[in-house]
Amino acid sequence: MTAPRSSTPRHVPVMLAEVLAALAPKAGAIYVDATFGGGGYATALLEAAPRTAVFGIDRDPEALVAAAPLARRFAGRLTLVAGRFGDMVGLLVGAGVRGVDGIAFDLGVSSMHLDDPERGFSFRADGPLDMRMDATDSTQARAADAVNRLPEAELARVIRRFGEEKLAARIARAIVAARARAPLKRTGELAEIVRRVVPRARDGIDPATRTFQALRIYVNDELGEIERGLAAAEILLKAGGRLAVVSFHSLEDRVVKTFLAERSGRSPLPSRHRPIPQAPARTPTFRLIAGIRRPSEAEIATNPRARPGRLRAAERTDAPPWSDAERRAA
């Protein structure tokens, strides 16, 4: 999630200083901004050291079109790549790159998407019930398809699983009752349905928040994409290369935490209460660095959306990637 646009042209992503410190950019190195968005990480990496090269990946064509001036400014050093970061290995190998020195991920939905009602991500402004990261992909289901077509039990499962919503069954029941009268097409319609059946929390969080999060994650397969992206990073990073991942809610962070715990050899040990199937020991492919970091109070004051951000970082060892072995064995 990137910071909202301001009156200045510079696009500043969440925890920029901390991400740069984790990646430790060096002259002549190759980096990947895996969630390019407004290009904040990419720009900072290009400015941080001479002769750095950055590949900016984004599945949203609109983001890459908007980045044309930045690409001209850093001609020969910034390469824009259209696609999903879960496909990073193929995308970069296709561009002639087989190893990189650092990869940054800024997970979740970008402020550019949230602030545009026509993209259908926000419950604060009415718009089409879309939520696709790539609005040009006609093969991908929209949020409207999910709320109008999923059986009630499956819809409740999605809202509970991806929104961590305790009242998922009640919400699904209300949605099914509403769609029986007329198909749901607008974010405003859905938000009002949820608000009618979910009490407002004491902390002031909108009752529709968790349902919208759940549908967005479901529509874009965000958790699966994160798993694929981290596995791709393991394959692409050179020994000593750095990985920096900023997540914004517990589901994202759990995927990142689990991956790094496994790959660094810090997974929970088996016990008689929680046995873990025996498997051949593997050499750790990452070394954790810096511990978990959170935004400073100063950053939160200027950008409240940064508050839930969590940064996890790791350094690649010289061990063969587990992901590559798994892919060959499949």
Give the positions of each predicted feature.
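S-adenosyl-L-methionine-dependent methyltransferase catalytic core, i.e., the SAM/SAH-binding region
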Residues: 1-330
